[in-house]
Amino acid sequence: MSGMRVYLGADHAGYELKQRIIEHLKQTGHEPIDCGALRYDADDDYPAFCIAAATRTVADPGSLGIVLGGSGNGEQIAANKVPGARCALAWSVQTAALAREHNNAQLIGIGGRMHTVAEALAIVDAFVTTPWSKAQRHQRRIDILAEYERTHEAPPVPGAPA
């Protein structure tokens, strides 16, 4: 999987790492698109940047997205508010790869204060190079979540009384 379009959004806590990731993606043949912050501002708030990156990723099938902040937690939550977005918090190479392979995640959240640059770039590389497995059991789970997102009706709990 090469030449991926990757939308990135970060607040002040992820700004410097986002800049490094953008350069790394360019050097490895990908097309990074910066959804902000476009300059460092210690008082900015992550939701706008993460929602912008997630919205653009969902609207561009086949693309991926990365949202960054201090921990990646709030950024992941913000991205997941976008209908159709599947954003996983990636804290290791393995979690980034599994986000793609098992969950067909289009986005990951990375904590800019949680990783060295080398660790973060390894997470990014795992995410952009791991293909979706297309395994039926994983697709079934994605479909259940998509149906809940569409209807707001929770799936039945197996074995629970009616």
Curated annotation (Swiss-Prot):
Source species of the chain: Mycobacterium tuberculosis (strain ATCC 25618 / H37Rv)
One GO-annotated biological process of the protein: pentose-phosphate shunt, non-oxidative branch
Recorded name of the encoding gene: rpiB
Functional pathway: Carbohydrate degradation; pentose phosphate pathway; D-ribose 5-phosphate from D-ribulose 5-phosphate (non-oxidative stage): step 1/1
CC terms in the record's Gene Ontology section: extracellular region
Record note on quaternary structure: Homodimer.
Protein name per the record: Ribose-5-phosphate isomerase B
Gene Ontology MF, one: ribose-5-phosphate isomerase activity
Domain of life of the source: Bacteria
Repressor in keyword set: no
A Pfam family recorded for this sequence: LacAB_rpiB
Family the entry assigns: Belongs to the LacAB/RpiB family.
Activity regulation annotation text: Weakly inhibited by phosphate and completely inhibited by iodoacetate.
Keyword Isomerase: yes
Note: In mycobacterial enzymes, the usual proton acceptor is not a cysteine, but is remplaced by a glutamate.
Residue stretches spanning the membrane: none
Assigned EC number: 5.3.1.6
Entry annotation: catalytic residues: E75 (proton acceptor), H102 (proton donor)
